Amino acid sequence: MCIRDSRCNDGGFLLGVMGNHTASAGVIYFPCGMVDMSDVKGGSVDLHGNVWREIGEETGLGRADLTEEPGWHTVFIGPRIAHIKVMHARESAEVLRERILAFMAKDKEPELADIVIARKPADCSDRVAPFVMAFLHSAWSNS
């Protein structure tokens, strides 16, 4: 899942820096998560439900804050597959970042250590996950 700031049409994306206590410490991803057994229903994986559960757990944002872009984007990097759901926000990236940081501050051990705003490749460090960079390059070249 990725959050794109559509209010100012600046192409900004919000990325989460994984906390030091996580298996992916310091890696930068879209605020999202892995599928877990609670996402498996009737032998199928509920990716849509996973997106909303994870976004709420990691950022405190919900359906009142975000609008889904239709469809999914799929990125293949070697043996890995990432399914990405783009979400549009009415608030600016800066305002959303502050809201998410305030939400994270209430958690004793938040999964994310920080939120980064990416509007162009220069905003991305070498810690950004390869599938995220692949998606961002595609999104920026098509906007």
Where are the regions a protein language model picked out?
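Active-site segment of metal-dependent pyrophosphate-handling enzymes
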Residues: 20-22, 27, 56, 60-104, ...
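Conserved Nudix-box catalytic region and its N-terminal flanking loop in Nudix hydrolases
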Residues: 11-53
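Conserved small/polar residues in nucleotide/adenosyl-binding loops
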Residues: 1-3
